[in-house]
Amino acid sequence: MEPAGERFPEQRQVLILLLLLEVTLAGWEPRRYSVMEETERGSFVANLANDLGLGVGELAERGARVVSEDNEQGLQLDLQTGQLILNEKLDREKLCGPTEPCIMHFQVLLKKPLEVFRAELLVTDINDHSPEFPEREMTLKIPETSSLGTVFPLKKARDLDVGSNNVQNYNISPNSHFHVSTRTRGDGRKYPELVLDTELDREEQAELRLTLTAVDGGSPPRSGTVQILILVLDANDNAPEFVQALYEVQVPENSPVGSLVVKVSARDLDTGTNGEISYSLYYSSQEIDKPFELSSLSGEIRLIKKLDFETMSSYDLDIEASDGGGLSGKCSVSVKVLDVNDNFPELSISSLTSPIPENSPETEVALFRIRDRDSGENGKMICSIQDDVPFKLKPSVENFYRLVTEGALDRETRAEYNITITITDLGTPRLKTEQSITVLVSDVNDNAPAFTQTSYTLFVRENNSPALHIGSVSATDRDSGTNAQVTYSLLPPRDPHLPLTSLVSINTDNGHLFALQSLDYEALQAFEFRVGATDRGFPALSSEALVRVLVLDANDNSPFVLYPLQNGSAPCTELVPRAAEPGYLVTKVVAVDGDSGQNAWLSYQLLKATEPGLFGVWAHNGEVRTARLLSERDVAKHRLVVLVKDNGEPPRSATATLQVLLVDGFSQPYLPLPEAAPAQAQADSLTVYLVVALASVSSLFLFSVFLFVAVRLCRRSRAASVGRCSVPEGPFPGHLVDVSGTGTLSQSYQYEVCLTGGSESNDFKFLKPIFPNIVSQDSRRKSEFLE
């Protein structure tokens, strides 16, 4: 807020500008129109369009209107014709009282640009009031010794009309003693005087009754009468005389009721009743509304009503002093009303625009006029508004002010302003008037919708039902009304191969997203697209957000056993030497699961066995191993059923059936892996050297016992028949892979070749790591051979 010392220069500048405007406008001659009082409502007064040199259409475009001094609605501008017409009957006496001429000041306001044309309407008087006397009967006491030509003042009649329609003449009923003389005061008003023509004789006629008639100058003339009772008294030598013929006093307008204005004093040289004086008020310039009261005994004049300098600035009174003998004297009292700062400044709003668009700088919000009924310094004013609003005042002509915006407003920051207009006069003490106006700011579409998040991640479990609600996006708009109404849409995907319109849809009103079809995690794990939010303003504004949909895997795939194959053909038979140690690797069940995550975590367990406790299955890798030492009492042929189960909910499973044959003195040649195995090709070089060395030693040993082993194998016919395995033609399904990261194919194994009867194709199966058993087997065979 600015310090007071900084604001006073601005206020002085505004005051100086107003004074300059007043001086400038004083040279303009206002247009004057006239109309008779009591003219009917709607009567033609003037053609303002022609007088202003404007077209009728231009008056409407510029918002022409008529503003009067006291905001009276007596005049109206017809924008269709450009004519100034009466909006109501005008009563001159009510508008101006005795003031002549009766002039109504008004202005014609035009906007875009702002122009003010001053004009006056003269309301002429018609003779619509008759003269009226203040009393129904007047009583005069006249001594019989009064000389001829003696003048006796009479109370005048009052007529609300002015000019020639006021009282012009007085006459009295025919009689032999008196006639009436009509006198004219300085203000032009007429008053009667009774003049004695012949001597009076109390003994002949003690009283007379006459009729006084007041006649105005109207056409036709109007009149009023009063009865005069004249009482003839005995001789009275001296008439009362006032100390002063003229009393001049000044009274502040804020004097309280009952205050003493002045005391008049008269004296009479007679004694007794002839010297007793009484005072009376027999003429006032404002008899319609007299604010004074005269004491008949003391001559004190006191206020009985509040004075108002702005209504009447002076009063003229005639005081009569009468003695008991019927003689009288008179004096005049001139009362000047002194102006005090007793009127608060006034503000009248001519136009107010609310709401106003938020993006409209230098926009006129209000046009108003200020005035102070006081005079001099008491009537000078300063107009201001508070500092914390983006508005300013621009002085115009004829005490008009324009309230305009300083710059563009922002409805989203503030949608309503309460502006207090303060008017302070320069009187002592200073009087202040405040008036508040409310200005609403209308919305302009200057804010785009904003999503609550720049990106959304939605999770959908596969195998969902079509039309499933998968999530929502939300955007808000800081504007209001239709500018804040948001509609949602799917934007074209950046990936041209993504069938977005067949995957999801969006509710344009609330941003709800729906899946249009059942999603398959194995076919589509995730996809993303953009959504748009557009408001309904003009022009429309929009924004966009990214939506990422992640398809959650469901346990909809059972484990698939890769080895041993479960295709209904002759199963492979695994050969296990009876000399195998506990933990001997018989084979490995290899399985995969098309799901992911824990749905693809596989576990193995031995479901059935010919001889429980002989074999065991490792739960995590599917390796089938011997659980104890084999003996000759164990049956040679075993059937194992291995259960492969995933970790889904609910879990899915598959089974693998194995044939295991226990043999005596069985060994297997080493066969190198195919060159195509990428994992073996990348084995550690040290391991390769060790394997080569071990293979060389084994080869030398095998060569020494080759004939012996071959003879033993040939003797066992069943060994030849069960050594075959059947493998289906064609590769394994390519999509069956282990996705667990620790699947059953994570280790490297050697393979052996099985030749099936009647076929020249080579098949494979896992080669059991027999090297640790060769030494023990060879030792046993050597002992047998030596025996």
Curated annotation (Swiss-Prot):
Keywords: Calcium, Cell adhesion, Cell membrane, Glycoprotein, Membrane, Repeat, Signal, Transmembrane, Transmembrane helix
Domain Cadherin: 35-133, 138-242, 247-347, 352-451, 456-561, 568-671
InterPro entries, per the entry: Cadherin-like_dom, Cadherin-like_sf, Cadherin_C, Cadherin_CS, Cadherin_N, Protocadherin/Cadherin-CA
Membrane topology note: Single-pass type I membrane protein
Source superkingdom: Eukaryota
Database matches in Pfam families: Cadherin (PF00028), Cadherin_2 (PF08266), Cadherin_C_2 (PF16492)
Signal peptide location: 1-26
GO CC annotations on file: photoreceptor connecting cilium; plasma membrane
Record bears the keyword Repeat: yes
Cytoplasmic side: 712-787
PROSITE patterns with a match to the protein in the record: CADHERIN_1, CADHERIN_2
Primary residence: membrane
Residues in the Extracellular compartment per record: 27-690
Biological process, per Gene Ontology: cell adhesion; homophilic cell adhesion via plasma membrane adhesion molecules; nervous system development
GO molecular function: calcium ion binding
Entry keyword annotation includes Glycoprotein: yes
Transmembrane segments annotated in the record for this chain: 691-711
Localization of this protein: Cell membrane
Residues of this chain annotated as glycosylated in UniProt: N418, N567
Effect upon mutating A719V: In a breast cancer sample; somatic mutation
Gene3D superfamilies: Cadherins
Function statement: Potential calcium-dependent cell-adhesion protein. May be involved in the establishment and maintenance of specific neuronal connections in the brain.
Protein name (record): Protocadherin beta-15
